[in-house]
């Protein structure tokens, strides 16, 4: 089984991954103003506030043109769906339309639907912590080896 996981991880890591902003969670406090601004833009985009989608769409379209060139007209642009249909629509509908307008990529948004709501990833953490408290945990660290 470990071999399959290793191969899957290798395949995932071999994929091209690009990012425009470096995100630091709020718990990381020692960050510069640029990181705070990036965090705010990400939150604004996810919450569909202040037309943040326009700035992100322009960054995305510019990058896609650089990476794909003329082939862009034959590529379908699809976003990984949000946790609910309402969040998916507020976050991606205008964004995907705008990216398509700016660079000519095919808009795949109309072909994606959220079939059922689920908790957002950050809303899962509390459940895991509660279920962990019902078990016995042995913490293993270097303290066991200090004489």
Language-model segments: which ranges?
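N-terminal accessory nucleic-acid engagement/regulatory domains that precede
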Residues: 75-79, 91
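Active-site-facing substrate-recognition patch
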Residues: 1-76, 84-86, 114-147
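Charged helix-capping and loop-helix junction motifs
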Residues: 91-97
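Short helix-loop-beta junction
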Residues: 97-105
